Amino acid sequence: AQAFPAIIRAKKILVLGDKKQFSNLQSYQATSIINNTYQNKLRKVFRENISKDAIQLERLASFNVKTSILDFFQRISNYEARLKKHFRGYPEHIAYCSKTFYNNDLQAIRLRTKPIKEVIHFENLKYEIKDEINNSNKKEAEHIIKQLEKIKSDKTSVSVGIITPFTDQQRLITSLIQKHKDKDYFEEELKLKIMTFDTCQGEERQIVFYSMVATKNKDKLNWIFPVDLANKDLEEYGDKKAQRLNVGLSRVQEKMYFTMSKSVEEFKNEIGNALRFINNIWASEEKLPKNKDLDPKSPMEKEVLQWFKQTPFYLENKNKVELK
């Protein structure tokens, strides 16, 4: 509805979007009663002046304020293409999203030149929630703030984001930051932004801390993330829980830092699959030649090695692959 005035004035229209990420928020939250009223009026005018054909009336359903521009134009587009290049993070950062949502089609442009431990980190605090309110975890919040203090003391110039599944945890971390003596430094120098998986679309940070909140005895992540994505057509259903997972795990540029209160093996459903997939990349030992082992007279060897390290086959089987 917002784009309609521009659409009727255009000679050519280029629509960019991704059905596996969130659609326009205002359209998603549009009032159903008002929307249905407009649709009923539209059907009446269409039947009286254009056609009563059932197929055409079915297509008329796309004239819906909750239908995204992307969905609307997919029915009548002359040409479609998928943009496969990923410029934000390293191959290891995007491997899960590429495999799960894009059939391993994403191609990370940036080549990792630092150890895997410097681009992915898992911290298990082995903590059980006690007096926290609702879906919050004070231990994880305090741990992340200590890491921010360390970044400041090391005088590291980076941008930082914090992403959590729960609004309660977002509020808790925000409250602790607001009371912190280094609040201004965090916000101005580190460009700190505290987000949920629902509010991080369009954002990117060099270091992203994930506060998962869940513990052994209290885990409500099934309300946030999908149970299982196997055999599910994400294009067809536009599952918001799946979109949430795809968006949240693709915001990082340099380092993913997962802060948890239990081991990755204890997480259930699809978020457990995601964490274990990324953890396997982080924990696996690389059995590849070092740069010093390559032939200095063959500069392409280094590039070929980097290309091989980006392949889905290698990322999923690092422990089993040895290259000499």
Language-model segments: residues:
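Conserved helicase C-terminal RecA-like lobe
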Residues: S153-G161, Q170-L190, M195-S250, K262-F267, ...
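Conserved helicase/translocase motor-coupling segment
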Residues: T100-Q178
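Structural recognition of the conserved hydrophobic beta-strand(s) that form the central parallel beta-sheet
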Residues: K12-G17, F258-T259
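Short, conserved "post-DEAD/DEAH" coupling segment immediately C-terminal to helicase motif II
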Residues: Q2-K12
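Coupling/hinge elements of helicase-like and P-loop NTPase modules
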Residues: R75-H121, S263-E265
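Conserved ATPase-coupling elements of RecA-like P-loop NTPase cores
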Residues: A1-F4, N24-S27
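Helicase C-terminal subdomain and adjacent C-terminal extension
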Residues: L25, Q29-A81, K220-L323
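Active-site glycine-centered loops adjacent to acidic/histidine catalytic or metal-binding residues
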Residues: D18, L83, G202
